[in-house]
From Swiss-Prot:
GO cellular component, one term: plastid
Keyword Mitochondrion: yes
Stated name of the protein: Transcription termination factor MTERF4, chloroplastic
Name of encoding gene: MTERF4
UniProt feature, compositional bias: Acidic residues: 521-541
Organism this protein belongs to: Arabidopsis thaliana
Species lineage: Eukaryota, Viridiplantae, Streptophyta, Embryophyta, Tracheophyta
Region (Disordered): 66-103, 503-541
Length: 541
């Protein structure tokens, strides 16, 4: 007997059942009543009754079979395995259908794509002249367009391809995340935009810095060293590398050493403002050896501290390459060893400049103009060390002035050796002093030859008042006796009945080292920052 029926399902499909009754089941009719159909469908195995049934059915394209109604465990197992198989087939079909749209690339594919993008970026950089060899391992933009944006931004800051090649790692900085925040912070501090180009050329690493973690603490530390907030931008412009130093490293040790040798604590802010490079100097390798060498030459440590307060840039002089060779050159030009301390104290720059060419030029000029004996050049330097930096034109003008005043070449030479300042004083003031000397004092020219330092004294403040007192008292004296003393000493001399020649100081240009060791007067100013100026053509008032 075969029974075929169908029933409704929620999903599309239809049910086919092939029923095979047991062998003892007598079939008399080709059709079944409704009750028989219900009994067959609702058949349950009764205890003790063994009825073997074979049911085959198909739903849509899936087939199920059961060999025995008395084996439900086997049926469930079969159904479970069939269901698992169908799930695997469904997953495979789904994977094949959606692979092209939702598949995730493998790590190998990602690395290949990354390498291809990096190759395009390198190709772009090489095309504009940048060598990307040092960029391996550095995180770079994914596309050449983003890299182009970075290069163009650096160009707007004034950096050239050569500048970028000098530090190609700058290409690893994001414009929005790194460059713009750093530059905005520097601008808010007061660093001038016109200095950004040179700033970045000297210290491009600043673009890698974090404003909060790296830059702000350094600025706060500088202010803690008594550098005024208004001076901080100038300090950064002059020495941008300071932004990369550790707070507890070289900066703190260099300041501590300077205070230890006698530099006044209140002067530290001004010193660092004028010469912030000190913050990057190692004490053991740079500062301490120079200070100790000055002591060997005869300059006490406290005097060296005062020199640093006045001229902090002397700490930047190379000891072995410049300072020691210059000291030897001075001795080669007949400067006495005992005079070296006073020479350096008066003009510290003399140990840091390119000295020999200057001395050769000065010797040649004076030998030609006033027939100077080369051996006399040493005494001239001892009296005025700044002489080595005077320009040719001002000196010739002063020599011409003296000869026009009536002095011979020999007298002019004697005056220059006795008081080299006559080669550098303000010519207008010298003319006024000479006119007063001639018309009011009516002294012979030889008095000026004997005491050429007359031109170094203020006409209104010193020369005229003292000359009037000398005339009033009817004293006849030399210019040196009248001028080469303090106001207090001069008043004492006016009370004398006779002139004591021994009181006359024969060398008014001598330098007293003790005056250098006296503490400086504290002067307040709006800003301690002063640009170092070239004093080559400076005239002494």
């Amino acid at each position: 007997m075969k029974i075929r029926f169908c029933n409704g399902f929620t999903k599309p499909g239809f049910l086919l059942v092939h029923f095979e009754p047991p062998s003892f089941f007598a079939v008399r009719s080709r059709s079944l009543s409704d009750s028989t159909y219900g009994n067959l469908c609702n058949h349950k195995k009764r205890p003790g009754t063994g009825i073997g049934l074979t049911v085959q059915c198909a739903i849509a394209n899936r087939r199920f079979s059961s060999r025995s109604l008395d084996s439900p465990r086997r049926e469930r197992s079969s159904r479970s395995s069939s269901s698992s198989g169908r799930d695997r087939d469904r997953d495979k079909d789904k994977g094949r259908d959606s692979k092209s749209l939702y598949s995730r690339p493998s790590l190998l594919d990602m690395n290949k794509e990354k390498a291809a993008n990096r190759a395009k970026v390198y190709e772009f950089l090489r095309g504009i002249g940048i060598v990307p060899d040092e960029l391996d391992g550095l995180e770079l933009p994914v596309t050449a367009d983003v890299m182009k944006e970075r290069v163009e931004f650096l160009h707007k800051l004034g950096l050239t391809i050569e500048d970028i090649n000098n530090y190609p790692l700058v290409l690893g900085c994001s414009v929005k995340k790194n460059m713009v925040p750093v530059l905005d912070y520097l601008g808010k501090l007061g660093v001038r935009k016109s200095t950004f180009t040179e700033f970045l050329r000297r210290y491009p690493q600043v673009l890698h810095s974090s404003v909060v973690i790296d830059l702000a603490p350094v600025v706060k530390y500088l202010q803690g060293l008594d550098i005024k907030p208004s001076d901080v931008p100038r300090v950064l412009e002059r020495y941008p590398e300071v932004l990369g130093f550790k707070l507890e490293g070289t900066m703190s040790t260099s300041v501590a050493y300077l205070v230890g040798i006698g530099v006044a604590r209140r002067e530290i802010g001004g010193i660092l403002t004028r010469y912030p490079e000190i913050l990057g100097m190692r004490v053991a390798r740079i500062i301490k050896p120079l200070v100790e060498y000055l002591e060997v030459l005869g300059i006490p440590r406290l005097a060296a501290a005062r020199l640093i307060e006045k001229r902090p840039h002397i700490l930047g002089f190379e000891l072995d390459d410049t300072v020691k060779p210059n000291v030897q050159i001075l001795q080669d030009f007949n400067v006495r060893e005992t005079s070296l301390p006073s020479i350096i104290a008066q003009y510290p720059e003399i140990i840091g400049i390119d000295l020999k060419p200057k001395l050769d030029t000065q010797r040649k000029l004076l030998c030609s103009a006033i027939h100077l004996n080369p051996e006399d050049l040493g005494s001239l330097i001892e009296r005025m060390p700044q002489f080595v930096s005077l320009s040719e034109s001002p000196m010739l003008k002063h020599i011409d002035f003296l000869t026009k005043c009536g002095f011979s070449i020999d007298q002019t030479r004697e005056m220059v050796i006795g008081c080299p300042q006559v080669l550098a004083l303000n010519l207008g003031i010298m003319k006024l002093s000479f006119e007063y000397f001639q018309k009011e004092m009516k002294r012979p020219l030889q008095d000026l030859v004997d005491f050429p330092a007359f031109f170094t004294y203020g006409l209104e403040s010193t020369v005229k008042p003292r000359h009037k007192k000398i005339i009033k008292k009817g004293i006849k004296c030399s210019l040196a006796w009248m001028l080469n003393c303090s106001d207090e000493k001069f008043e004492q001399r006016m009370s004398y009945d006779t002139i004591d020649i021994e009181e006359v100081e024969t060398d008014p240009s001598s330098f007293d080292m003790n005056t250098l060791m006296q503490p400086e007067r504290e002067e307040e100013s709006d800003s301690e920052y002063e640009e170092e100026e070239d004093d080559d053509d400076e005239e002494f008032a």
